[in-house]
């Protein structure tokens, strides 16, 4: 079976190229998110997977669900997805679209896990250091996890920096085992 990312990638790229050219990347992000959420609703998913319905009727049903939140260009995009039997990959299209958008805007969502809550000044300092290291604007989301004991664990895209006491203790335990 073909990977959904393989199916969704060209649609995500096309959506981003169109939205970028029209200066509507944020509104397309919202519309794609809405459509992605809609196709995951069990009732809508059942309707879209019903083999008795034509692709046109499936598209019309999804467009009705989206209502006025989808502009004409987006409805045409949904029509294209429907004609190619790709409505079910909308959640993956949205995820890939967001990745492409973040790359184009040179932004990166990062999670910083700490044992204790950091102050705004500490978060800003950390975000600035990460932005410099990764050459991107970093948006930090803080998660407090007392199990870390101390230090920080940072996840930014493919980069993971484990500066936690728990991580250091795990490394020490591994080195003692060998």
From Swiss-Prot:
One of its GO terms (molecular function) is proton-transporting ATP synthase activity, rotational mechanism. Transmembrane segments: none annotated. Keywords: ATP synthesis, Cell inner membrane, Cell membrane, CF(1), Hydrogen ion transport, Ion transport, Membrane, Transport. Its main location: membrane. It holds the Pfam family OSCP. InterPro entries: ATP_synth_OSCP/delta_N_sf, ATPase_OSCP/d_CS, ATPase_OSCP/dsu. It is a peripheral membrane protein. It is found in: Cell inner membrane. GO terms for cellular component: plasma membrane; proton-transporting ATP synthase complex. PANTHER family: ATP SYNTHASE DELTA CHAIN. NCBIfam families: ATP_synt_delta, PRK05758.2-2. F-type ATPases have 2 components, F(1) - the catalytic core - and F(0) - the membrane proton channel. F(1) has five subunits: alpha(3), beta(3), gamma(1), delta(1), epsilon(1). F(0) has three main subunits: a(1), b(2) and c(10-14). The alpha and beta chains form an alternating ring which encloses part of the gamma chain. F(1) is attached to F(0) by a central stalk formed by the gamma and epsilon chains, while a peripheral stalk is formed by the delta and b chains. F(1)F(0) ATP synthase produces ATP from ADP in the presence of a proton or sodium gradient. F-type ATPases consist of two structural domains, F(1) containing the extramembraneous catalytic core and F(0) containing the membrane proton channel, linked together by a central stalk and a peripheral stalk. During catalysis, ATP synthesis in the catalytic domain of F(1) is coupled via a rotary mechanism of the central stalk subunits to proton translocation. This protein is part of the stalk that links CF(0) to CF(1). It either transmits conformational changes from CF(0) to CF(1) or is implicated in proton conduction. Belongs to the ATPase delta chain family. This is ATP synthase subunit delta. It comes from Stutzerimonas stutzeri (strain A1501) (Pseudomonas stutzeri).
